Amino acid sequence: LWKAAKPGEPFWESPWGKGRLGWHIECSAMSQPYLPLDIHGGGQDLIFPHHENEIAQSEAACACSLARYWVHNGFVQVNAEKMSKSLGNFKTIRDILENYLPETLRFFLLGKHYRSPIDFTADSMDEAEKAQHRVFTALHEAGKALARDKWKKTPLPQEMAEEWATLPKAFDAALEDDINTAQALGQVFAQVRLVNRLLEDKGLRAGETGRDLLQDFLARAQEWNKRLGLFGQDPQAFLAELRSQRARRA
């Protein structure tokens, strides 16, 4: 609450001697008019003592909850070592975007649960790029298939239709489970696998129910974009961007 002044430091006079307010009380003072906060974020290293002190101070002063939800992120690591300026192993966003598209960086970050540490390496970014390529290739091929004029009344296998119907709920459930973006992306790839299976089967691909599934797939991609900020670009244009980016790195 109160830091005693050391020689040469700024200070205020108080009943407890010369000093200044502590770091923790600053946050409580600034946030007081807005309590309770909907979401309070920060790194895991701030849980103790900073956030615990914020809670103690704010709840004692205001007789109300400080925050409804706490979001504590894990650390970015480089080759399994914490990224930090002191170690000289940090990368800026500008550095990364010299070699990768912004969407690839976003995909990489969302591929891990936000509370987990994430290891930044060139290999992990390359894997994120390959995964993006799989999704956009499926979107592109689905669009090409839908451009055909003739469709037959060929039903989807029941197990495929049932699995397809359950996947959006699984996607939503993942995000509702402490914003588990990694699990949500897993549901995206489950849908990509079904679409690829459909596209590889000429009989299913030509069916009206197959057409409906492909149309639904493209619509779901727009929903993923709203929720995650991914997969909303024109597939053909994005695949061309990926190729250009890879060529620049080569």
Where are the predicted features?
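Alpha-helical recognition segments enriched in aromatics with Gly/Pro capping
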Residues: 1-145
